[in-house]
Amino acid sequence: YDFTHILIAGYGLNLLQVAPLLPYYDIDPNIVQFMGTGVIDDKTFFYEPSLQGAIFPGIPETKRINLINNYMEIYEEEFLRISTLPYDLMGLINFIYTKKYKFGDVIELLNNPNKKFDGIDGNFYFKNNMIERNLDILKISNGNSYVIN
């Protein structure tokens, strides 16, 4: 091979169609490291044989399992993975409200990359008006993912 890694940027049905084709075209996952994006942090993909050993950025499910279980208990519906974003936003708004920050204080807070917030999906901070996260590298194995860094 002329490469050691391959980034699979698909999701959903697309990912489940593409990943199994790679070994068919002689891209051996035992030789080439399959990498995904954070969107493959979904149990659906953890059982796909061609994705065993694949790595992706994320945080362990244990960090958000209480929220997922509480949501299911209250609403009797499955927790949408993207719901951690507004959940963290509400936590940040509550922090600002309880500290009685003025507008200038909020701007200063959000422009300080040294100020990190503990969110459901890991620590996050603002840098140049963008959200940055400190993520782990997770590896898929036998229906689960685990931290390798």
Predicted regions and their residues:
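Extracytosolic ligand-binding ectodomains
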Residues: Y1-N149
